[in-house]
């Protein structure tokens, strides 16, 4: 992924202090603890005035859901910030979390992406697996503003000349 981003001219900076999102498992046991963990990562990015780019659909979903919860509830954001202040952090809510697929479609564009291909993949069939976190809940993922996100992997596959094969597990957890 880093090579793809570099080829597309996108500079990346690793957030050394970022932790794993908890993959939704932590949130099932203790949602506030999971949200503190994820908003902490967003606060690090916010301090650097950077968005979060992820290739993991679970990370995308978990961070986006945590961000959505604090942005729609200022009192909850204050609770989270009271925990973050112990580390000298505060989250104001300006960090955008974007999956690499969304960057390819929304920021680069499929036409520009196609210009970077060395070979077309005609004759190949791929069965895309999104998982559940990158497609649900849609209100936390910006689908109303960007409806193409629901089909982003299909769109990237088709742009290579390959064909998409649907299967029932495409968006299952």
Where are these regions (language model features)?
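Iron-sulfur cluster-binding electron-transfer modules in prokaryotic oxidoreductases
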Residues: 1-173
